[in-house]
């Protein structure tokens, strides 16, 4: 249990720093995992929020408890594009309100949510970083945010790869 607390603290510390750099309203780490199997042994893959930070005064609430074991088949297009492009942007508009990806928009004041893929050292997708932004979308701004979030992803890989993290801690 102690290692779990240390892992979460290491993740949260890195997330807060990135959140402050890009002025995000919320930052969260989501990991893909295996869910329950069907009677024929087919795995049901899911995604869960393992860590989040909400900016003080943002007017949005934490979502970690409700963003637990969500079936990824609800987000086939989103996950496919995230894997292909390493990035996916969800705009808060009428079109999004008719899709399952709206769960990544916490409040009306959020203009967009940017997802950045997380990969392990073997280039297998682990999950994604989600940042919710209250400021209006601009391509240049989102590209700058992506650069910072890509750096965060690099920092998180050894922490999320538990065996690598324990090796680093013992050095």
Label each PLM-derived region with a short phrase.
Residues 111-120:
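A short, aliphatic-rich beta-strand micro-motif
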Residues 125-171:
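Juxtadomain coupling helices with adjacent low-complexity linkers
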Residues 48-108:
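Regulatory sensory and allosteric helical modules in signal-transduction proteins
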Residues 102, 115, 128:
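Short hydrophobic/aromatic beta-strand element in the GNAT-like acyltransferase core
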Residues 1-58, 162-171:
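Intrinsically disordered, low-complexity terminal regulatory regions
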Residues 36, 95-97, 134-139:
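Short acidic, S/G/P-rich loop/turn micro-motifs used as interaction or catalytic elements
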Residues 10, 108-110:
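Short, glycine/acidic-rich beta->alpha junctions
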Residues 7-14, 73-76, 145-153:
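Well-ordered, non-membrane alpha-helical segments in soluble/globular domains
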């Amino acid at each position: 249990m102690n290692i779990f607390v240390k892992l979460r603290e290491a993740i949260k510390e890195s997330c807060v720093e990135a959140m402050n750099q890009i002025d995000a309203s919320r930052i969260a780490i989501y990991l893909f995992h295996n869910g329950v199997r069907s009677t024929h042994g087919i795995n049901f893959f899911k995604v869960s929020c393992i860590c989040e930070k909400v900016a003080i005064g943002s007017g949005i609430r934490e979502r970690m408890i409700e963003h637990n074991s969500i079936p990824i088949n609800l987000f086939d297009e989103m996950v496919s594009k995230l894997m292909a492009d390493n990035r996916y942007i969800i705009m808060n508009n009428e079109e999004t309100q008719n899709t399952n990806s709206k769960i990544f928009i916490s409040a009306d004041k959020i203009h967009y949510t940017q997802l950045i893929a997380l990969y392990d050292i073997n280039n297998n997708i682990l999950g994604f970083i989600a940042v919710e932004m209250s400021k209006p979308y601009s391509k240049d701004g989102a590209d700058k945010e992506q650069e910072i979030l890509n750096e965060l992803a690099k920092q998180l890989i050894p922490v999320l790869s538990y065996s690598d993290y324990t090796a680093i801690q013992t050095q």
